[in-house]
Amino acid sequence: MARKSLIQREKKRQVLEQKYHSIRQSLEREISEVSSLDDKWEIHRKLQSSPRNSTPTRLHRRCFLTGRSRANYRDFGLSGHVLREMTHACLLPGMKKSSW
């Protein structure tokens, strides 16, 4: 199980990303539309002044049962070893046992 502080940090990043999503999109759109280099730099400075954790690249998917950040399957929201355990226990409909 992941530490609670890591999970809370990830939730904080998700909130910040949602808060600044529209602002970042509009600034990125402005950068692509403006032709003057000085204007692009000014808009880029505004973009850089937003918090680091507001970028979507800093988000990690986590297993909703264990909080593990590695080997996550998007379709299930589970990490690999939890997915395997649940499959063997017949808790996931439509999944078949495999030798992996």
UniProtKB/Swiss-Prot annotation:
GO biological process: translation
Keywords linked to the UniProt accession: Chloroplast, Plastid, Ribonucleoprotein, Ribosomal protein, RNA-binding, rRNA-binding
Gene Ontology CC terms: chloroplast; small ribosomal subunit
RNA-binding is among the record's keywords: yes
Compartment(s): Plastid, Chloroplast
Subunit structure: Part of the 30S ribosomal subunit.
Protein name per its UniProtKB record: Small ribosomal subunit protein uS14c
UniProt organism field: Cycas taitungensis
